[in-house]
Design a protein with these regions (language model features):
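Histidine-acidic metal/acid-base catalytic patches
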Residues: 1-30, 82-85, 141-160, 164-250
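Glycine-rich, proline-tolerant flexible connector loops at the mouths of alpha/beta enzymes
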Residues: 37-54
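Short phosphate-binding/catalytic loops that engage adenosine nucleotides
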Residues: 33, 58, 124, 221
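Active-site mouth loops of central-metabolism enzymes
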Residues: 7-19, 63-71, 98-104, 201
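Active-site surface patch of divalent metal-dependent phosphodiester/phosphate bond hydrolases
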Residues: 51-59, 65-66
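A short acidic, amphipathic alpha-helical/loop segment
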Residues: 48-52, 76-77, 171-178
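A cross-family glycoside hydrolase active-site/sugar-binding cleft signature
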Residues: 7-11, 37-39, 61-66, 90-92, ...
Length: 250
């Protein structure tokens, strides 16, 4: 699995990045990361941001772009992604005004197909990122499965957050095995033991990484993106995750 790409979702270090995006990118590169995924740009001009990526040896694997941005400023979104050299645009969550039920999943799937069509026409790939809510029941399936079934595989891919799937009681490895070719990206963080199931650096928790990473490899996943929502020490935890992830992917 040595050809897999570890990356850092910059949301993990968001407070540092809000104060000093460019300096934080340099620190991320100094840990050994070679790719990042953005969740906002820290108010920095995108040309300058791209120059910094090039200078420190990082590439933007993608960026999280809320679905409403496509409705209000889609052309600008595409221009931003191209400037940064992103491969993927990722919808990070459903719109706030869509109910998380089966009809809502159909509505989201329709939006995703539309965004995916715009991205494909612009030479980009489009994916959807989950949390736990997408694994609520929808008939005999889950909302995530409904979105998977109702989206065009030529237009829409998925960024499966392994932690949130497992948090919801879903076997994430089995999900990957059921959907080969649809999940090019995964988000990785670990889960603490106990009822709180707090997130932890990769390798410092209870998730079955050998099983998960082999399932991801079988599914054709190439991007392994560290994202810790509530890191105790964001830089230290990001470095720990990278060290452990690199060892696991060898």
């Amino acid at each position: 699995m040595s050809d897999r790409i570890p990356a850092l979702q910059m949301y993990t270090v968001r407070e540092l990045a809000e104060r000093d995006m460019l300096g934080t990118l340099a620190q991320v590169a100094g840990m050994g990361y070679r790719a990042v995924e953005f969740a906002g740009y820290g108010g920095i001009g995108l040309g300058r941001l791209r120059s910094t990526l090039d200078e420190v040896g990082l590439r933007a694997i993608g960026a999280h772009v809320p679905l409403w941005h496509w409705m209000e400023r889609g052309d600008q979104v595409l221009e931003e992604l191209h400037t940064l050299g992103c491969s993927y645009a990722v919808a990070p969550s459903p719109p706030d005004d869509v109910r998380m039920d089966e009809q809502g999943a159909w509505d989201i799937a329709k939006m995703l197909n539309g965004c995916g069509e715009r991205c494909r026409a612009a030479g980009l790939r489009f994916a959807y990122h989950n949390h736990a809510d997408e694994f609520a029941s929808a008939g005999k399936s889950s909302l995530w499965e409904v979105m998977m079934e109702r989206t065009d595989p030529e237009l829409v891919e998925f960024e499966l957050d392994l932690y949130w799937a497992e948090y919801a009681g879903v076997d994430a490895a089995e999900l990957l095995d059921r959907h080969p070719g649809r999940v090019p990206l995964v988000h990785v963080k670990d889960m603490a033991a106990g009822p709180g199931k707090e997130d932890r650096p990769v390798g410092d928790g209870t998730l079955p990484w050998d099983r998960l990473l082999h399932a991801a490899a079988r599914a054709g996943t190439t991007g392994y993106i560290v994202e810790q929502d509530d890191a105790v020490d964001p830089l230290r935890d990001s470095a720990t995750s990278l060290k452990n992830l690199q060892r696991m992917l060898q």
